[in-house]
Amino acid sequence: MRINPTTSGSEVSTVEKKNLGRIVKIIGPVLDVAFPPGKMPNIYNALVVQGRGNEQTNVTCEVQQLLGNNRVRAVAMSDTDGLMRGMEVIDTGAPISVPVGGSTLGRIFNVLGQPVDNLGPVDTNTTSPIHRSAPAFIQLDTKLSIFETGIKVVDLLAPYRRGGKIGLFGGAGVGKTVLIMELINNIAKAHGGVSVFGGVGERTREGNDLYLEMKESGVINEENIPESKVALVYGQMNEPPGARMRVGLTALTMAEYFRDVNEQDVLLFIDNIFRFVQAGSEVSALLGRMPSAVGYQPTLSTEMGYLQERITSTKEGSITSIQAVYVPADDLTDPAPATTFAHLDATTVLSRGLAAKGIYPAVDPLDSTSTMLQPRIVGEEHYETARGVKQTLQRYKELQDIIAILGLDELSEEDRLTVARARKIERFLSQPFFVAEVFTGSPGKYVGLAETIRGFQLILSGELDGLPEQAFYLVGNIDEATAKAMNLKT
């Protein structure tokens, strides 16, 4: 892995002033810069704009196009307010580089790898460029194993692959960010894993809430910051498209160091991968490229592949990536979510219908998929239980029109039994979360895979047909459901 001994590309003091250009044009966050003949910077090089005289205007840009006539077009990583034509621009001679390693844990960074949490500078001289090629095929690890999350609906019906890529699909307000926070919490506590969280183009308030939640739950250790389990990298909604487009790569670069150098298993969370595409679309238009379907950039598949192919498992360690995917207007055929689908090992689809019923997590058990749900990987018992649950829920879905028109009484005895079990299963798929204790009033539950399988087997077998369906709502394992049923009877 290529490591640069310098600090962030934005700090001018570390840059030799050997290649100077001047701004000739500014269009919002895009700058055209002229350089002397024969001194053109490479694509992806970081450029730093210097203020005139005593002005402190250190704006870092990234070269995106070579225009000819000794000019390049670059995209700014921060606001371009105050920039003027004629200002001096320094070519740093390398891509943006960010700090990596254990000292990044417990800290919040921006796209340039600068800490933004007011806790002082990062104690490391080890940095890494955000642009690098994906691992070679010969380095990849191809073993298949399940990554247990402690969330019943996920582990049973759409299990995650260790070192795989998982998509959380859903419209606005159905619980993607809460699910991501719960996964970070469970993974830190149950697996002791290191996580990197990339906040790409989401709300600043959510980033702040997540940080405070992590401090409360001990994922970030305030007393001893290096003992923390997560590094946070934020490029929020209010930032220019250049920052939102590159913040995912900054987070990935930090995760790659833990995988390749520290040889650890890492969790990379990206919230939200759609905003990465959206930022690319904005930049593409500013660079003058012709838009393709639905106004997206023509390079959509290439950009997505460039990011996703670096998220993989090698013989040294693994990166398991969980990516929230906002689905515009709940349309799964939109080019952004459709392009993301191609790279995923598992999909967790959140349903507005389930959220409306108050069933959280609102994971759709029929739409969510996983390449891991095969008998040779998960075992016959798990596979048959999951298949039985899906068949029961599918039959319930088919019967809903008849129930709506004619009522339950018109169904056959067998169908009435199927409906009763399906409603119990639907409620048992809900679960109280640690990070949502404030909303649910119930303490969070981590449910192991064996317990999950046992619970659903009991419902499918008919052993629990006599229990009321509300006993299965917002509980952990099946023993809690039977205890709750006893309380309801008294």
Curated annotation (Swiss-Prot):
Keyword Translocase found: yes
SMART domains linked: AAA
GO BP term, example: proton motive force-driven mitochondrial ATP synthesis
InterPro entries linked to this entry: AAA+_ATPase (IPR003593), ATP-synt_VA_C (IPR055190), ATP_synth_F1_bsu (IPR005722), ATPase_a/bsu_AS (IPR020003), ATPase_alpha/beta_chains (IPR050053), ATPase_F1/V1/A1_a/bsu_N (IPR004100), ATPase_F1/V1/A1_a/bsu_N_sf (IPR036121), ATPase_F1/V1/A1_a/bsu_nucl-bd (IPR000194)
GO cellular component: chloroplast thylakoid membrane; mitochondrion; proton-transporting ATP synthase complex
Top enzyme category: translocase
E.C. designation(s): 7.1.2.2
Positions with a binding annotation for ATP: 170-177
Alphabetic keyword roster: ATP synthesis, ATP-binding, CF(1), Chloroplast, Hydrogen ion transport, Ion transport, Membrane, Nucleotide-binding, Plastid, Thylakoid, Translocase, Transport
One Pfam family here: ATP-synt_ab
MF terms (GO), sorted A to Z: ATP binding; ATP hydrolysis activity; proton-transporting ATP synthase activity, rotational mechanism
Membrane topology: Peripheral membrane protein
Catalyses which reaction(s): ATP + H2O + 4 H(+)(in) = ADP + phosphate + 5 H(+)(out)
Primary localisation category: plastid
Subunit organization: F-type ATPases have 2 components, CF(1) - the catalytic core - and CF(0) - the membrane proton channel. CF(1) has five subunits: alpha(3), beta(3), gamma(1), delta(1), epsilon(1). CF(0) has four main subunits: a(1), b(1), b'(1) and c(9-12).
Function: Produces ATP from ADP in the presence of a proton gradient across the membrane. The catalytic sites are hosted primarily by the beta subunits.
PANTHER family the UniProt entry points to: ATP SYNTHASE, ATP SYNTHASE SUBUNIT BETA, MITOCHONDRIAL
Family listed: Belongs to the ATPase alpha/beta chains family.
The protein's name in its UniProt record: ATP synthase subunit beta, chloroplastic
Organism, scientific name: Ipomoea batatas (Sweet potato)
Gene: atpB
